[in-house]
Structure formats: C-alpha cells, structure tokens
C-alpha cells in the first residue's frame, strides 16, 4: 500500500509533500489509498493528513476518522473539507498554509557566519520566551531528541531553528537584537543541508499571509505549492 500511496500522492507532489515524506521516512500509518484520495496518520506526531482531489471521497475519509474517534490534529487539502471537518469532528481551523520544499540537486551554500549547534538545556527558557508555540519543557524535549539547533556568535544565542514532530522544518526565530542581518537564511540553510544529507526532501509549512517567510523560502531555492492546505486542531 505504501508504493501505491506514494504514486497517488506524487500526482500532486508539492501539495502532498508532507504526506509523501511521512511515507518515504517510514513514519506513515496508511489508512486508505486510492487515486485522488489518501488518508494517513503520521506516527511521530499523531497528526492525520488527508488528501482529496474531490469533495466526495474526502468526506468519506472524514467519516472514517469519525469512527476512529481519536483525532486531535488534522491537515486537509480542501477548504470545503476543512469546513466539514469542523462540523463533523469538532475541530477548529488553526491556520492555512503553503508547503514549500527543496527539490534542487544540492543544498544551498551556507553563509558560515554562525556556529550552529545543539543548544544547552539551560537556554530552554530563553528559547521558550521567544517562541510562543513551545513551553520550556517542550523545548527541552526537542533538544534531547536532536530536533532543535541554536545559531551562535561566540557564546551569544542569535536565533534557533528545528524540526516539528511530523518532520517539517520550522521553529525558526532570530532574537530581536540580531534581526535584519540575514541570519534566518543561515539557520534555515543549515536545516535544509541537514535534511538533504539525511536523504530527506527538506520541506516546511508557511502561513499563507507570512510574506516575509515566503520571500525567505524563495531566496533559499524552495519550491512553493500553488494550492494551500488547512491545519485543524481540537481546542
């Protein structure tokens, strides 16, 4: 079923890059795979991901999720299925986003201005203070899993970047006093290079209204999906 799922997902490659990477990395529990409609659960995060070219097969997959009864986070590829998921599963739209992915044959050249390394756990509080989506305990968990990196000038933390549980590049932040120097490029190019050399396709999820970040992705050579996706969560 994995080969079949990849075949169908790759028919709209950029739209489905998070799903196809979950399959490629061995982190996908595939619940259904048909041409134009694939449903999986990403094992590391527990996030369900639903691709449907048309509404009707997507609605059928939402009903399958209703039967499972354990959905806390869900990504869908259609606005009408987003609305149906809110109604049927009791989820709420968290954000709308574009997938971006690095599809080039070699990674971008690193600027080499920062020393990028795993930060000490003593910096977890500082990182949590500058990134609203993780608390201090969650930051420590990311550090221990090797999924969070800091950029340093000497012993000063300039910014940080990491990997979300479902495998996307994110958690990117440059501390206020170091902004407007291009350090975000340095940090993300490091993560792209890291994933590239691990045999992964580097990808990220960017809010549709975050033009600053979308511009950064273009500078890095990332390809952007034409169609947006929708992330829902239980609140």
Feature annotation, model-predicted:
Residues 80-91, 185, 208-226:
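Conserved active-site alpha-helix within GNAT-family acetyltransferase domains
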Residues 169, 202-206:
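Conserved hydrophobic beta-strand within the GNAT/NAT acetyltransferase core sheet
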Residues 56-65, 180-195, 211-219:
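Conserved acetyl-CoA-binding loop-helix of GNAT-fold acetyltransferases
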Residues 1-3, 89-120:
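Conserved N-terminal entry element of GNAT/NAT acetyltransferase domains
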Residues 42, 137-177:
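A conserved beta-strand-loop-helix scaffold within acyl/acetyltransferase catalytic domains
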Residues 90-105, 205, 221-235:
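Conserved catalytic-core motifs of GNAT/GCN5-like acyltransferases
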Residues 1-73, 78-83, 128-133, 139-141:
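N-terminal charged segments
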Residues 35-36, 156-159, 212:
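Glycine-rich acetyl-CoA-binding "A-motif" of GNAT/NAT acetyltransferases
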